[in-house]
């Protein structure tokens, strides 16, 4: 089975977490933490900065490395590096997603996330409880 390595941004603003809704593929309409695949020779940190610029036309600053999770989808194995980030600019544009919103940490369990993204929820809750 093929392994795909990605990075995701857990962007927190005023105690709320930024999530995006997929507009394509088998998991269309599911929610996720924005990010994408590492390019050859690229670090997970460089990947997340690039992906957020490509997907949202926004600049971010990485605050800290949150976690890495692994999940096996039917056709590939995913390794996802998760970073706590903050927006450096107030402007964002949805270039690849159907929708986006900031949600309260208490809402996370009720959102229809992609299977791999669900595995990050406990790490996010712990990070917020410890004030990052």
Model-derived regions, located:
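Generic C-terminal helix-cap and adjacent flexible tail
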Residues: 1, 125-132
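A conserved beta-turn-beta hairpin within the catalytic core of GNAT-like acetyltransferases
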Residues: 26-30
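The catalytic Nudix box helix
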Residues: 33-65, 104
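Active-site-adjacent beta-strand/loop module that shapes the phosphate/pyrophosphate-binding cleft
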Residues: 69-91, 101, 124
């Amino acid at each position: 089975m093929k392994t795909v390595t990605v990075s995701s941004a857990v962007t927190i603003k005023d105690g709320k977490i930024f999530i995006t809704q997929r507009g394509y593929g088998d998991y269309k309409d599911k929610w996720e933490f924005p990010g994408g695949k590492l390019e050859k020779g690229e670090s997970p940190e460089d990947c997340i900065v690039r992906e957020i610029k490509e997907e949202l036309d926004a600049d971010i600053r990485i605050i800290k490395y949150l976690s890495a999770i692994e999940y096996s989808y039917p056709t590939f194995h995913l390794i996802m590096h998760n970073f706590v980030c903050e927006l450096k600019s107030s402007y964002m544009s949805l270039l690849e997603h159907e929708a986006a919103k900031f949600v309260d940490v208490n809402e996370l369990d009720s959102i229809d996330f992609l299977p791999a993204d669900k595995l990050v929820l406990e790490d996010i809750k712990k990070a917020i409880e410890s004030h990052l």
